[in-house]
Amino acid sequence: VLLKKRTSQYDKKFLLEIDSKIILKKFGVPIPKSLITNKSNLKKNNYSINKLKFPTVLKGTGSNHKTENGLVFLNIKSKEELVNIQKKMNKINGDILIEEMIGPISLELLIGITKDETGLFALIIAQGGIYSELFSKAVNSKELIILPASKNSIQKALKSLAIYPIFQGYRGLPKANLKKTIEVIMKISSLIEENDKNFEEIEINPLIITPKNAYAAPRLQARVEATLYSANAR
């Protein structure tokens, strides 16, 4: 996937999850292993499905509110169960995303990058996923860094969060990989810095942290000043 300038009038749009993950993967951001198919071809994709590790998640790709619209099926434990779910997929039209569920989950973060009125980009690191509500009233619920960010500044921001003790394995929870978390946040920041004219905002919620890595479950907001088209990834 490449980004190419376009001279037409600016217009904001949200990219589909599939497109978002293609872009993030190109910049080295880990994403769950996945397969893109559709209802009619689901049974024909046995070879590719066999490469996925169960449990998996099945998602319709055409809506920003997948869970509310019945377009998400979680914790699918076998290929047989996956095929049987076809009978419940009346609301899904178009492509289907099947991806491995990530675990064990140590914690979830929200990573956001937005442009202010002066044209500077600000990196926001906060509690994400289920922790957003749990720590919403905490004093240190989020940290802000003006880009470009360094590894030290990101580490300092993470250590300032109320959620930070979970990185150390709070009360028996699996430890979260701090080093990988910092590396992934740096890669997300690089995406914006290298394409500052194409992207206006990124929000990844959640960034899933495990004992071994950090994975993006993203939604990207881009300007249509940038045209996405398929090409060889670098």
Give each language-model segment a name.
Residues 1-234:
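ATP-dependent carboxylate/acyl-activation modules
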